[in-house]
Amino acid sequence: MFRLTRLSNKPILSPIKEHEWEKEAVFNAAVIYEGNKFHLFYRASNNKFVLNTEKPEEKYKFVSSIGYAVSEDGINFERFDKPVLVGEIPQEAWGVEDPRITKIDNKYYMLYTGFGGRDWLDFRICMVWSDDLKNWKGHRIVLDEPNKDAALLSEKINGKYVLFHRRMPDIWIAYSDDLVNWYNHKIIMSPKSHTWESKKIGIAGPPIKREDGWLLIYHGVDNNNVYRLGVALLDLKDPSKVIARQKEPILEPELDWEINGLVPNVVFSCGAVEVNDMYYVYYGAADTHIGVAVIEKEKVKF
């Protein structure tokens, strides 16, 4: 069994009260390592979450956007004053959430959740793309159904794009020739009853390629709504096959800022990178702050 080790016992990013768009929460960050720098794309919220009404109400409206920060060491980040991505289409009327970024053929694809706010199931997987990590374009729905927790694989398999997504409560895979039409949807992982991942599961960030398979970090939720991180290994040539899955979580809420926040008892990742034989896993804590935890590549053994 292996677990992640926190690089810091304090958040590496927290809300900035002077910035209207990120004054209440920063969490759930995608990460890309390019040009010897960590590029972090995080979800931010301008308001607290009121989720117990029959449907979303305008007086409680919270809008999510995507902020951008950059670092040379993976822990000390320079932040930008304005979001790099905001909602532009009706499906994004209440914002853009939980980004996951994959580089394919020198282009970056960000998949995220667009929340329309017309009812609580008005969330869709959406996509934008960029050539430089700064200018994003596209803003279109990937799957027109209530769905989230999606990312693309960094390589095509048998000439096809590969999508991971989450139809409740499982992790699914699908394929496409053009990033528009998706087919052969299939469950690859399901929750396990009477465990830390009994209620639902979903991928963290895009799987990371290793010599022995695709490393998939994912979140699991128990019946008390505690969010933890787990890990599995997918077959290199056929990522629909799970060849290993650790029984125990690799990270769970333990520190005060992971236990207490807008949504308590949550560690939730949208991205990890391999740098100098070390995996850096960025995670949202209690839907309020961002932390980072690491593990040496050689210690990841199933």
From Swiss-Prot:
<keyword id="KW-0119">Carbohydrate metabolism</keyword>
<keyword id="KW-0328">Glycosyltransferase</keyword>
<comment type="function">
    <text>Probably involved in a salvage pathway for GDP-D-mannose biosynthesis. Catalyzes the reversible phosphorolysis of 1,2-beta-oligomannan. In phosphorolytic reactions, prefers beta-1,2-mannobiose (beta-1,2-Man2) as substrate. Produces alpha-D-mannose 1-phosphate, which is the precursor of GDP-D-mannose.</text>
</comment>
<dbReference type="GO" id="GO:0016757">
    <property type="term" value="F:glycosyltransferase activity"/>
</dbReference>
<comment type="similarity">
    <text>Belongs to the glycosyl hydrolase 130 family.</text>
</comment>
<comment type="subunit">
    <text>Monomer.</text>
</comment>
<keyword id="KW-0808">Transferase</keyword>
<dbReference type="InterPro" id="IPR023296">
    <property type="entry name" value="Glyco_hydro_beta-prop_sf"/>
</dbReference>
<dbReference type="InterPro" id="IPR007184">
    <property type="entry name" value="Mannoside_phosphorylase"/>
</dbReference>
<protein>
    <recommendedName>
        <fullName>Beta-1,2-mannobiose phosphorylase</fullName>
        <ecNumber>2.4.1.339</ecNumber>
    </recommendedName>
</protein>
<dbReference type="Pfam" id="PF04041">
    <property type="entry name" value="Glyco_hydro_130"/>
</dbReference>
<comment type="pathway">
    <text>Nucleotide-sugar biosynthesis; GDP-alpha-D-mannose biosynthesis.</text>
</comment>
<dbReference type="GO" id="GO:0009298">
    <property type="term" value="P:GDP-mannose biosynthetic process"/>
</dbReference>
